[in-house]
Regions:
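A short beta-loop-alpha structural element at the N-terminal edge
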Residues: 55-68
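Conserved GNAT-fold acetyl-CoA-binding loop/helix
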Residues: 65, 69-95
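Acetyl-CoA-dependent GNAT
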Residues: 85-139, 150-151, 211
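Glycine-rich acetyl-CoA-binding "A-motif" of GNAT/NAT acetyltransferases
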Residues: 110-113, 175, 202
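Conserved catalytic-core motifs of GNAT/GCN5-like acyltransferases
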Residues: 116-119, 166-169, 181, 186-203
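Conserved beta-strand-loop-alpha-helix junction that forms the acyl-donor binding cleft
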Residues: 141, 167-177
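Conserved acetyl-CoA-binding loop-helix of GNAT-fold acetyltransferases
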Residues: 142-155, 178-182
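Conserved GNAT acetyl-CoA-binding A-motif
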Residues: 157-169
Length: 211
C-alpha cells in the first residue's frame, strides 16, 4: 500500500500548482489592465465632463438676447460676416426678423450660436422667401456647430412653409460659403462692388439659395 504521507504530499503539490496558476493568471490580468490604462489614460474623463459636450438646439427666447447680441458683436468685429457696424437693440432686431425659425445652439450649457430669418419682400407672392442670419461665437467656431444650426434652421423653415432660403455672403467669408454649400445652398449670383464697408472699400457679395 502507498504510504498516507505520500498522498498528503501529492495533494499539497496539486494545491500549490493550482494556487500558483491562479496567481499567475490574476497577476497577468492586473498587469494587462495597468498597461492598457496607461496607454489610454488620455481618453478617460470624469463622468461629469460628458455634459460639457452636449449639444442642444432650441427656439430662441427674449432672455437669450444678452448672449445673442454678444455673439452678434463678435461677428461684426470680423468685418466679413456682415455690413452691420453695430448691434441693434432687441426691439429693432425683433421687428426685423420673423417670429418663427429663431434658433440657438448650446454647447455644454453655453449659448454658442444663433440663427434667424427675415423676409426679403413684404409682398404676398414672396411670403415663402427669407434671408438667413447665422452666427457662431468666436470660441465655438470650427467645431461643426454652424452646420448643425443651419441644418436645423433649414428643417424648421421648410416645416414653417418657406420654399426658398437665401443668404448674402461677403466676398472674404469663404467659410460661410462652404457652410451654406454643405447645407444644400447653391451659388446663384455674384454682385461686384455692390457695397462699401466701414473703411470705404468696395466689396462683392455672393447670393446663395436653397430651394
Amino acid at each position: 500500500p502507498v504510504p498516507l504521507l505520500y498522498h498528503k504530499q501529492v495533494r499539497c503539490q496539486n494545491n500549490f500548482c493550482a494556487v500558483r496558476f491562479l496567481y499567475r493568471a490574476a497577476n497577468s490580468a492586473i498587469l494587462k489592465f495597468i498597461r492598457e490604462w496607461k496607454e489610454n489614460a488620455g481618453n478617460f474623463r470624469p463622468a461629469e465632463d460628458e455634459s460639457m459636450d452636449k449639444i442642444i438646439i432650441r427656439p430662441m427666447t427674449p432672455e437669450d438676447w444678452g448672449a445673442v447680441s454678444r455673439i452678434y458683436v463678435e461677428g461684426i468685429a470680423t468685418e466679413y460676416a456682415t455690413f452691420q457696424t453695430e448691434c441693434p437693440p432687441y426691439t429693432a432686431w425683433d421687428a426685423s426678423h420673423t417670429k418663427e425659425c429663431r434658433l440657438v445652439i448650446l454647447s455644454g450649457g453655453v449659448l454658442a450660436g444663433w440663427c434667424a430669418l427675415h423676409r426679403v419682400d413684404p409682398r404676398w407672392c414672396y411670403r415663402g422667401v427669407a434671408e438667413v442670419s447665422i452666427y457662431v461665437g468666436e470660441q465655438f467656431r470650427g467645431h461643426g456647430l454652424g452646420f448643425q444650426l443651419l441644418s436645423a434652421l433649414c428643417a424648421a423653415a421648410e416645416k414653417a412653409g418657406y420654399w426658398t432660403l437665401q443668404s448674402t455672403v461677403l466676398q472674404d467669408n469663404a467659410a460661410s460659403r462652404a457652410l451654406h454649400a454643405k447645407c444644400g445652398f447653391r451659388l446663384v449670383g455674384h454682385r461686384e462692388r455692390i457695397a462699401r464697408d466701414c473703411h470705404g472699400h468696395w466689396l462683392d457679395t455672393y447670393l446663395m439659395e436653397r430651394r
